[in-house]
Amino acid sequence: MTILENIRGPRDLKALSEAELGELSDEIRDFLVHAVARTGGHLGPNLGVVELTVALHRVFESPDDRILWDTGHQSYVHKLLTGRQDFSKLRSKGGLSGYPSREESAHDVIENSHASTVLGWADGLAKARQVQGERSHVVAVIGDGALTGGMAWEALNNIAAARDRPLIIVVNDNERSYAPTIGGLANHLATLRTTDGYERALAWGKDVLQRTPVVGHTVYEALHGAKKGFKDAFAPQGLFEDLGLKYLGPIDGHDIGAVESALRRAKRFHGPVLVHCLTEKGRGYEPALRDEEDHFHTVGVMDPLTCEPLGPAGGPSWTSVFGEEIVRIGEERADVVAITAAMLHPVGLAPFAERFPDRVWDVGIAEQHAAVSAAGLATGGLHPVVAVYATFLNRAFDQLLMDVALHRCGVTFVLDRAGVTGVDGASHNGMWDMSVLQVVPGLRIAAPRDADQLRTQLREAVAVDDAPTLLRFPKESVGPAVPAVDRIGGLDVLHTADRSEVLLVAVGVMAPVCLGAAELLEARGIGCTVVDPRWVKPVDPALAPLAARHRLVAVVEDNSRAAGVGSAVALALGDAEVDVPVRRFGIPEQFLAHAKRAEVLADIGLTPVDVAGRIAASLALAEPAGDRAGGPAVEQPGDGRMSGDGRIVMPAQGEN
């Protein structure tokens, strides 16, 4: 057995020799490369924290000592060392999550995986332990760009205010955020400043000098200032120490002994300490190190030797379609600019940045600032396009509401990874945007159903200069084009029937689901009209008279069914005094487990069979048994779905 295979928990690390620790690190990297290549996942960040994670678990007693991970995608090594070595179904249904998970292990504390939050968590946990008289340690690991987030600095400000509250902050500086500091004097002074003896001597000297009449305070301030200036010339800790944090480093994050030594010194303090570790993203895997874009931050299923993607080739992604079209628009309009929050490549803005380097800004992990800056750009006569993941726009709701919408700024928000994202798990599903944003006055929301509509609606959005607009689209490849057969007002009609009883409102990428459901229903003699509203907020006025000609309206959306498009449609029909029942199909009010997107949609009942079955059951409840022409009466179980042989079975969770 390998050394790694013999590790059942953190305590097994403590008896290993220096040579064995080096061998273990090599085994972990080899394991990660091959395991993540089979499933896809975050490879580069985890290759960079191998020694750091080993040192953390050798110095601290997890789970009694709480080790908290910011941006939890760098927790794979932590999982391996805490008894979770079955990576065969990583990020797959029934397998390990790609992020920390409380359901998996007592060693996992934070699982939301949104960056820059760990220091706030650590501040609260440290306060709780101090109030309760506990002596265990709280260790917050932050890095991979997370210190660009404003929340991290808000937390640092509060952490530093309590000089007597122990808390250890480990900065994983993987050369993507900080410039490394060099020089033995800097290391020596950092070590000196973090010894108990030095702190006692400093406190004694300060007390003596400040009690000396007339000159004492002046002498102390002069000496203290000279010391700070001398040290800051060699090391970057001035900012942290000015906040009141003890600074230790920089430390070679790939030297287990050096990291352990720094962490043990940090444990001896009675206040907040920051340990600065220099690491290399993608360490030990040459293809990752050669990847200038992001050092293999995330990879799909691939050959670990050639790095060639494996599996069936998909079509163009939604992201790439957006990226190509925004460049075309930029060629035509010099006023169109772009903003993203540390996601230039993932959201498709890299081609725009290459073509127009002076018209794009990456603001770091700062969605709030992105929205407010966009308001300023719009007020200055430009049209900003803010491209972020849908789940991260939640952070900028107040700014979108009060800075963009209130001021009627012409800003276009483009939400990538909207709806069910699947394998990235609960915190990365973009399933709340169309619910949360329903309350924003003046905001227009578009949900394109295919690539052509994405291109068209993006152009429609940037043409609006007196209100905010928003487009949303999912992860993965774009499906085939879904042509319209007619247009009623602003509605695209995708399907009609001679005797239509059901109006299916297909929100964006749910169009194929609705068309499939219509086909199943019509096989049972239930005629359907399928429309795509294109712009789902505000509700198109043409929908009310169309709905009035049907027995039932069903709204199908890849969004929370609570307060989503279905609710908005029901409200609009009520205001228009159209007395037709509205059934809402969407994502239930729960956090979704990681699985493939298709698996999640099936689990929550967003498939053609599920939608058709529950619509048939609803119609059966609305009339006496045997009244329907064209077939036998449908059973009336209260609610249900259509099985393959036409029977009604109990529903899944995605409808009410």
From Swiss-Prot:
Pathway participation: Metabolic intermediate biosynthesis; 1-deoxy-D-xylulose 5-phosphate biosynthesis; 1-deoxy-D-xylulose 5-phosphate from D-glyceraldehyde 3-phosphate and pyruvate: step 1/1
CDD domains to which the protein is assigned, alphabetical: TPP_DXS, TPP_PYR_DXS_TK_like
Keyword Transferase: yes
PANTHER family according to UniProt: 1-D-DEOXYXYLULOSE 5-PHOSPHATE SYNTHASE-RELATED, 1-DEOXY-D-XYLULOSE-5-PHOSPHATE SYNTHASE, CHLOROPLASTIC
Organism annotation: Streptomyces coelicolor (strain ATCC BAA-471 / A3(2) / M145)
Cofactor: Mg(2+); thiamine diphosphate
Annotated GO biological process: 1-deoxy-D-xylulose 5-phosphate biosynthetic process; isopentenyl diphosphate biosynthetic process, methylerythritol 4-phosphate pathway; terpenoid biosynthetic process; thiamine biosynthetic process
Swiss-Prot/TrEMBL keywords: Isoprene biosynthesis, Magnesium, Metal-binding, Thiamine biosynthesis, Thiamine pyrophosphate, Transferase
Pfam families, per database record: DXP_synthase_N, Transket_pyr, Transketolase_C
Stretches the record annotates as Disordered: 625-656
Quaternary context: Homodimer.
Protein's gene: dxs1
Binding site for thiamine diphosphate: 73, 113-115, 145-146, 174, 285, 367
Family that this chain belongs to: Belongs to the transketolase family. DXPS subfamily.
EC main group: transferase
Known function: Catalyzes the acyloin condensation reaction between C atoms 2 and 3 of pyruvate and glyceraldehyde 3-phosphate to yield 1-deoxy-D-xylulose-5-phosphate (DXP).
Protein name in the entry: 1-deoxy-D-xylulose-5-phosphate synthase 1
Binding sites annotated in the UniProt record for Mg(2+): 144, 174
EC number annotated for this UniProt entry: 2.2.1.7
HAMAP family: DXP_synth (MF_00315)
SMART domains the UniProt entry points to: Transket_pyr
PROSITE patterns membership: TRANSKETOLASE_1 (PS00801), TRANSKETOLASE_2 (PS00802)
Single GO molecular function: 1-deoxy-D-xylulose-5-phosphate synthase activity
Catalytic activity: D-glyceraldehyde 3-phosphate + pyruvate + H(+) = 1-deoxy-D-xylulose 5-phosphate + CO2
Gene Ontology CC annotations of this record: cytosol
Cofactor: binding details: Binds 1 Mg(2+) ion per subunit.
